[in-house]
Amino acid sequence: MKMRYVLLGLVLMAPLWVMAEEQEGAPGRTIEDLFLSQDIELQILRSQALGTDPEMKRLALRSIRAMVEQGVTSDGVFVVLEALASEGVSRQVRSQGAIVNNFPLIRREATELLGQVGGERAKNTLLRVLRDDPEVVVLAEAAYALGSIGLNQNNEVSDYLVHTLLRENARSTPDNNLAYSIVISLERLSEANGGLANPEVINALIETASSPYIRTVRMRAVDAIVNMRDHGR
């Protein structure tokens, strides 16, 4: 898995949580709706994703990764990815009161694949992940994936990322990987959109550069500030 932790070595203020509408024309199907599908491969993916065995979920993700790499995806495949990205968070399975499908590494991989699929719907799903997921490993992947997609209409994505970064900066022991992923994504969004209009982006990066992160993160924030000043010129 291409997780960004290797880059480091060890390596949400305002009411931002009103989600954007689903992509115009996108069917609002759920993974349960796929039971009606006549596509055998899709039925297999659904069964693997809905089970409580993490190995079956990994098999589903392996198949989806192969499809994504071949450029072959469908609405049904996307629905499966959405479900896996919220596995154990918004979609919970309980046994005797305990959640039995809380698999952060499954959510992380599904989140990574959503970034590769791209588009408005993937962006919206990733914003929900960034809002709801309690695991920093998943949040870091979601932040990185949002930068890879590059969409930032009305500063929606950059506002989410800045909110998350400022929250992390305020912690006594902030997570280096999450901050590093957000810094990279803000820079990518700036480059893809000819700069970022929200002045809070630079302020958040300046704060990051002086927060208790490892030197790699602090210097990356400084580099991002320098590079982003050129994007709007």
What do these predicted ranges mean?
Residues 18-22:
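Boundary at the C-terminal end of the N-terminal hydrophobic targeting segment
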Residues 41-61:
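Long, acidic/serine-threonine-rich intrinsically disordered regions with weak helical/coil propensity
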Residues 28-48, 70-96, 119-131, 151-168, ...:
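Amphipathic alpha-helical scaffolding segments comprising HEAT/armadillo-like alpha-solenoid repeats
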Residues 8-15:
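Bacterial N-terminal signal peptides
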Residues 1-7:
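Bacterial N-terminal signal peptides that target proteins for export
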Residues 25-35, 55-72, 96-100, 104-119, ...:
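Structural detector for internal amphipathic alpha-helices that build alpha-solenoid repeat scaffolds
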Residues 133-134, 211-215:
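Short coil/turn segments at helix-helix junctions and helix-capping linkers
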